[in-house]
Curated annotation (Swiss-Prot):
Keywords linked to the UniProt accession: Ribonucleoprotein, Ribosomal protein, RNA-binding, rRNA-binding
Source species of the chain: Natronomonas pharaonis (strain ATCC 35678 / DSM 2160 / CIP 103997 / JCM 8858 / NBRC 14720 / NCIMB 2260 / Gabara)
Task of the protein: Binds to the 23S rRNA.
Name of the protein described by the UniProt record: Large ribosomal subunit protein eL19
Upper lineage: Archaea, Methanobacteriati, Methanobacteriota, Stenosarchaea group, Halobacteria
Signal peptide start and end residues: none
The gene coding this protein: rpl19e
Amino acid sequence: MTDLKAQKRLAADILDVGENRVRFDPDAQAEIADAITREDIRELIEDGTIEAKTAKGNSRGRARKRQQKRAYGHKKGHGSRKGRSGGRQNEKEDWQSRIRAQRRELRELRDAGDISREQYRELYDMASGGEFDSVADLNRYIDDKHGEQ
């Protein structure tokens, strides 16, 4: 068995693939052994004596199946989680959505005349300070404090 390492290295460089992907025709080993220049290797590639194996990829089938399950809300339990909760749900975005909802609710209440401008300003500042956890919490507070008036 002749040593074809040099030919394999040249062929890999010409084909722009790794050496493991270069395939020699087993019937033409003597012909390949005689090829010592890059031009000789190019001719053998054109003849089909030397060729590049197709690259193997990783199958995405299982990953697609898992993504489909997660779309339904499955496979999201505590055992599947890595990192802190803020890594899964951005805390800033969480805050933004909550404060926007609370401010929208306050605007609607003010425009409907359910709360005065002064009460609106007081509640707005409280919401900005993180006093309320949610719109429901805000409405509960309003019913308790301002519902009496």
